Regions:
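Feature captures hydrophobic
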Residues: 1-154
Length: 154
């Protein structure tokens, strides 16, 4: 009843989500939304996708490694990615001849890496130069978020 009586949208949403969680749990949400590749994500530009990649990267998996990646996007600008001790930096239109890895992909291939979808990674991304094991380590460093966590229950 509190959810229907609250005037504030934020309070109303909190009460109604809590009631839904108590009745149904948190496992009833669509699986596609958990992957982070919905229409909103597909509409992001390359820089926003790379920012997202930097956010979800598990820095502890690559904390002892430093390498560079030439990212050639077939439908957007090219980027130089530098990974130094688990921190991802990117530079627009700054490819390097000395990069450890060169990959080519459409912009949506960035989302394939962030979602960990190996089928789409194989389909969309081409390793032009460099060690494929390094590319796999880069892909494996992406953390999988649990988007649907409990709001009111511990």
């Amino acid at each position: 009843q509190l959810g229907y009586q609250a005037e504030s949208g934020a309070w109303r949403n909190a009460y109604l989500v809590a009631a839904f969680e108590l009745r149904n749990g948190t496992g009833l949400y669509p699986k596609a939304a958990q992957l982070g590749v919905g229409t909103t994500a597909q509409g992001m530009d390359a820089q926003t996708m790379l920012d997202y990649m930097g956010i979800i990267m598990d820095t502890e998996k690559l904390q002892d490694r430093s390498f560079t990646i030439n990212l050639k996007l077939t439908d957007a600008d090219d980027y130089l990615l530098k990974l130094h001790h688990g921190v991802l930096l990117y530079y627009k239109d700054a490819l390097s001849d000395e990069a450890d890895l060169t990959i080519s992909t459409p912009r949506i291939g960035i989302l394939a890496i962030t979602s960990g979808n190996q089928e789409n990674i194989d389909k969309l991304i081409t390793v032009e130069k460099g060690d494929k094991a390094l590319f796999q380590a880069f892909c494996d460093s992406m953390a999988a978020f649990d988007l649907y966590f409990n709001i009111i229950e511990p």
